[in-house]
Amino acid sequence: MLTKIGLYTGSFDPVTNGHLDIVKRASGLFDQIYVGIFDNPTKKSYFKLEVRKAMLTQALADFTNVIVVTSHERLAIDVAKELRVTHLIRGLRNATDFEYEENLEYFNHLLAPNIETVYLISRNKWQALSSSRVRELIHFQSSLEDLVPQSVIAQVEKMNEKT
């Protein structure tokens, strides 16, 4: 039987509970999942890559079929081919996400027609949540409870101690 391997990518700057919900749900659908931290060339990162990887790895520690990977200046579809991924996993919060993902899927399919894209719709609880909003809350030192995993809260507290 074919092993189903998924790749869920994002900048995870920082990882949110919405991201974790997608991973949790996908982990039951796939034999193995790679969670890939990619830099978005159109955005300046708030957290350094190694910090994002540490927060994400800690947040996903209980998942036995999930591996965190990073990539610099490469297309996710190229990394997917290298990892022998069978499916790309994408989370959709709203129509704007869908339009973006629809365009991305078109090009991914051109580059790797054998890799399918699977979309998981965000639960209502997480549809308004984004890393951008979390960064805004961090800037104003607002509570992050119920929005991000403890690894992110601990990192933010550590950063606040230094200032």
Swiss-Prot record:
Annotated metabolic or biological route of this protein: Cofactor biosynthesis; coenzyme A biosynthesis; CoA from (R)-pantothenate: step 4/5
Coarse class of the protein's main subcellular location: cytoplasm
Domain of life: Bacteria
Entries under SUPFAM superfamilies matching the protein: Nucleotidylyl transferase
Cofactor: Mg(2+)
Catalytic activity: (R)-4'-phosphopantetheine + ATP + H(+) = 3'-dephospho-CoA + diphosphate
EC number, UniProt record: 2.7.7.3
Gene Ontology MF annotations: ATP binding; pantetheine-phosphate adenylyltransferase activity
Compartment list: Cytoplasm
Record site feature (Transition state stabilizer), residues: H19
BP-aspect Gene Ontology terms: coenzyme A biosynthetic process
Sites where the protein binds substrate: S11, K43, A76, R90
A GO CC annotation given for this chain: cytoplasm
UniProt-listed Pfam families: CTP_transf_like
HAMAP family to which the protein is assigned, alphabetical: PPAT_bact (MF_00151)
Function: Reversibly transfers an adenylyl group from ATP to 4'-phosphopantetheine, yielding dephospho-CoA (dPCoA) and pyrophosphate.
Self-association state and partner proteins as the record states: Homohexamer.
Homology family: Belongs to the bacterial CoaD family.
PANTHER family per the UniProt record, alphabetical: PHOSPHOPANTETHEINE ADENYLYLTRANSFERASE (PTHR21342:SF1)
NCBIfam families in the cross-refs: coaD_prev_kdtB, cyt_tran_rel
Protein name: Phosphopantetheine adenylyltransferase
